[in-house]
Amino acid sequence: MSRFNVRQVAVLGAGVMGAQIAAHLVNVKVPVVLFDLPAKEGPKNGIVTKAVEGLKKLTPAPLGVPEDAALIGQANYEEHLEQLRDCDLIIEAIAERMDWKLDLYKKIAPFVNDKAILATNTSGLSITKLSEALPEAIKPRFCGIHFFNPPRYMALVELINTPTTAPDNLDALEAFVTSTLGKGVVRAKDSPNFIANRVGIAGMLATMKEVENYGLTYDVVDDLTGKKLGRASSGTFRTADVV
């Protein structure tokens, strides 16, 4: 394919990951529009507005300049799907429900332009299974792009292809993630939880087994497996609580 020129990115889902991915795109001066469901009360973009405002209060800060939150475009699936036509990269980051993701893909498919890459930020669902909801024309441009929390600070991004992902498209996306977003990319197979989470969960389970063997308390384990092992902020049990 020709050079992947990302003029604008759409992020679908204004939750913890979606909002922070949008923030990091703003940090590196990439225009971005953040989508979510229409609010049931008040302005239709209320869910996204609340998420964008929340970015200013998070620690560690997802925005290099808090005022740059205003640069994140706000949209909802009811009124603004036409905006997807102007996006060269669409990152889906909604809740980890296969059925919800498949429904969303069917809704957005008519608005994905014929050169855009569509990528899911799922942390472990089957990328191939997700691709089954897409038209044949989009499947070569669909893949997994797994950021880690918090995305501004975590260097790793996993890229996952399906049997129908065009290699040139994955190469182009990797170039964007490394050169523009400043991330290190590891390509993973479409296996449960990919690489990092699969290894991480195995480590947690092994640690929990030792807790039983030695009668350790949660606080002691989190102290031993937290900053003493180089983890940024949390040990085994605290991490298990949030993932």
Where are these regions (language model features)?
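Substrate-binding/catalytic subdomain of NAD(P)-dependent oxidoreductase enzymes
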Residues: 160, 186-243
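Short glycine-/small-residue-rich Rossmann-like dinucleotide-binding loops
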Residues: 94-95, 123
